[in-house]
Amino acid sequence: MKLRLYERADAPEVLRLWNTAGAAAGYAPLDAGKLDELLLAHPAFCGESTFVLEEKGALRGFAAGCTGDTLAQGAVRGYVSCVLLDETCDTAENTALLLGAVEDSFRAKGKSVAAVTFFNPLRLPWIIPGTDGHRHNNMPGIAKDIPLYERMLALGYREAATEMAMYLDLAAFAYPAAMEERAAKMAAQGYTVDWYKEGVHRGVDEMVASLGNSMWDAEIPAAAHGGMRLLVGLS
């Protein structure tokens, strides 16, 4: 098994791994264009922190990390984006080999922490467990029911938080009467909820920027100014 840096010519094999090993880990299926957009040709993609395992000319493993001083805690953190292994070589040893290469690349850039969180700008879609293919907007970490989770703990990673999928089937939803009563009480106190109206409601860019979340910075103002229906609280 040969460990080496990822090359652009590896993209078709990475796509195969994504839609096999990645699908088994819970990632949403992607075509080549979407995988490029979200990962392999994303502006935050770091070729020097992306590695493959090769056996007799075939890719058996892939791991990607990214760094950047403008990222959240980017002065000290490197972000592990994904680790994929073909089922024929999905072992703790190969996981350690790939992760070790990514971590070494972080150290070479002066980083002291390897993290797997939603602050990673490479936001990879995954299927919410128990749903009929519904996607969460970004892979928040490592699913607890796959081998990679226990392997990373054994390698010294620690669980900092558990994210629960945000999903509700609204087919039979009915607005509760109690919420109508609460809305009336809040309105009497000068607090209301409305749809965001461009040119009427102001300060969304400044409000989001003050929260210091790069994902929200990129998505929420653009959605508001682009006409997406967003709820806003007003006082």
Segments from the language model and where they lie:
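Short amphipathic alpha-helix that is part of the acyltransferase structural core
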Residues: 1-39, 52, 163, 178-215
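Conserved beta-strand in the GNAT
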Residues: 52, 58-68, 79, 230-235
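A short helix-loop-beta-strand connector motif used in the catalytic cores of GNAT acetyltransferases and
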Residues: 39-52, 61, 73, 221-232
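Acyl-donor-binding surface of acyltransferase catalytic domains
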Residues: 91-187
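Basic, amphipathic N-terminal segments that precede the first structured/catalytic domain
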Residues: 31-34, 42, 46, 73-75, ...
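Conserved acetyl-CoA binding element of GNAT-fold acetyltransferases
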Residues: 74-88, 117
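Compact recognition or signaling/catalytic modules
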Residues: 194-202, 216-235
